[in-house]
Amino acid sequence: MIKAVMMMNTQGKPRLAKFYDYLPVEKQQELIRGVFSVLCSRPENVSNFLEIESLFGPDSRLVYKHYATLYFVLVFDGSENELAMLDLIQVLVETLDKCFSNVCELDIVFNYSKMHAVLDEIVFGGQVLETSSAEVMKAVEEISKLEAASNSISLVPKSVSGWRGR
């Protein structure tokens, strides 16, 4: 099971953090700080896989990938394959690149609802749902269409809404 998905910049600011087990906000912040301190102290020429039992408990592992100014991090238990989790980060990044045409930190900050939609199509409740970037894109585009359609529907007749503006 996946325990957490995090995206943070190289200064340690979390840009997206999703925990699949309930944790109080203070504990989440403590874990994010702990993960960042581990990541920023690692040289570039070492493995992207870590045992992280000291932070997340027994049988916890972490895999990360560093792209430009962002760390993409997955924390998971022993039931998940480490290479599959690394590939899942790649799927997430490829999908985000398709959504935002070369994703950057600002895309994550200003499009958080779309970010969560993409992540929820890939991982939900700590379980991997989809590993195809194309399928995730189809689902996200459908969600965007439905949101656009629901935004264009007005529940208040124009005659009444015109009256409210006076």
From Swiss-Prot:
Key words of the record: Cytoplasm, Cytoplasmic vesicle, Golgi apparatus, Membrane, Protein transport, Transport
Entry membrane topology: Peripheral membrane protein
One Pfam family linked to the record: Clat_adaptor_s
GO BP term, pick one: Golgi to vacuole transport
Knocked-out gene: effects: No obvious phenotype.
Location of this chain's protein in the cell: Cytoplasm; Golgi apparatus; Cytoplasmic vesicle membrane
Cellular component terms per the entry's GO annotation: AP-3 adaptor complex; cytoplasmic vesicle membrane; Golgi apparatus
Complex formation: Adaptor protein complex 3 (AP-3) is a heterotetramer composed of two large adaptins (delta-type subunit and beta-type subunit), a medium adaptin (mu-type subunit) and a small adaptin (sigma-type subunit).
Protein family per UniProt: Belongs to the adaptor complexes small subunit family.
Function description: Part of the AP-3 complex, an adaptor-related complex which seems to be clathrin-associated. The complex is associated with the Golgi region as well as more peripheral structures. It facilitates the budding of vesicles from the Golgi membrane and may be directly involved in trafficking to the vacuole. It also function in maintaining the identity of lytic vacuoles and in regulating the transition between storage and lytic vacuoles.
UniProt-recorded name of the protein: AP-3 complex subunit sigma
Source species: Arabidopsis thaliana (Mouse-ear cress)
